[in-house]
């Protein structure tokens, strides 16, 4: 019996959603066993060598709060690997944690990847997973995985649409007969909304806030359409004029204004996907095409409220006028 075969006896098959904001690990027979931020904290020594200090939730708490010799890094950007070595370290940590720290574990892994990923980016994910301890690596396109998980009738001879808004990318796909008929992947999602909120507050109030604060604003009072009540939240940051700490109040209307371009880009991607549908699928009434809107926890509730159509009416994702 070979060493990989022996290692396989100590391993469990895993499915990994390697997201820009969060990484989820699913174990066969147990369901989702890990859901942690895709963040790694590293310490640099005098020679510039890096050492992993923490991964996941503990590392995310360090973002924006570290001294000069410690950095908190997100190795994923726009749905793909931005730092190979750190992504490998993060994957190794999650694999070992999923196997209760067992070093002999060499599992078979299936990883979700964006539909618009290049061969170079796909190879980087495969090599990172193998270096992290995977025995075999398989891929599934994220729109297909999301559609199956959402319960869409992907094997039927009619169109289904999935709109998966994550941290780094938004995946829009039309599926039929077990395959992806057409898909659009845009690098506009939760992270871009955070950046838009930071820039909006910086320009309007001359106040500099961090990405964690922007995410908190988005998930607390963010919205894509006016609600019944105007919500507000206190924001703390650094006054760019005086350089001192400052507190101000921002309301939900301002947040909606700040992320309007990002919301429009996502709606435009949905429209483009519909325009690319084959004529045969277009024979089905639009109202009969099941559309699922999946939103990353780091983006809710900014887009969990209905979006307006072009006439300003409130529409559900299923009946959105595009």
Q: Where do the language-model regions lie?
A:
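Nucleotide/phosphate-binding catalytic cleft detector across ATP-hydrolyzing
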Residues: 1-165, 173-322
């Amino acid at each position: 019996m070979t060493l990989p075969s022996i290692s396989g006896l100590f391993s469990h098959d895993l499915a990994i959603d390697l997201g820009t904001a969060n990484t989820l690990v699913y174990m066969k027979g147990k369901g989702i066993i890990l859901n942690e931020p895709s963040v790694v904290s590293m310490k640099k020594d005098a020679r510039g060598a890096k050492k992993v200090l923490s991964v996941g939730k503990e590392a995310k708490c360090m973002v924006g709060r570290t001294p000069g010799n410690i950095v908190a890094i997100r190795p994923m950007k726009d749905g793909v690997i931005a730092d190979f070595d750190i992504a490998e370290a993060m994957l190794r940590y999650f694999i070992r944690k999923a196997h209760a720290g067992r070093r002999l574990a060499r599992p078979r892994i299936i990883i979700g990847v964006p539909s618009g990923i290049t061969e170079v980016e796909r190879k980087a994910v495969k090599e990172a997973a193998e270096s992290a301890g995977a025995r075999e690596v398989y891929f599934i396109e994220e729109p297909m995985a999301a559609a199956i998980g959402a319960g869409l009738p992907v094997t039927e001879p009619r169109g289904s649409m999935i709109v998966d808004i994550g941290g780094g990318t938004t995946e829009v796909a039309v599926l039929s007969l077990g395959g992806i008929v057409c898909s659009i992947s845009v690098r506009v999602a939760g992270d871009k909304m955070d950046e838009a909120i930071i820039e909006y507050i910086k320009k309007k109030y001359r106040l500099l806030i961090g990405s964690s604060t922007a995410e908190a604003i988005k998930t607390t009072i963010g919205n894509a359409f006016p609600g019944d009540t105007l919500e507000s939240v206190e924001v703390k940051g650094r006054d760019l004029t005086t350089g001192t700490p400052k507190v101000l109040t921002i309301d939900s209307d301002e947040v909606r204004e700040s992320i309007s371009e990002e919301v429009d880009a996502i709606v435009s991607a949905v429209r483009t996907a519909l325009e690319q549908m084959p004529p045969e699928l277009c024979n089905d009434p639009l109202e009969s095409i099941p559309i699922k809107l999946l939103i990353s926890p780091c983006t809710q509730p900014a887009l969990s409220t209905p979006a307006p159509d072009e006439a300003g009416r409130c529409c559900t994702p299923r009946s959105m006028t595009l």
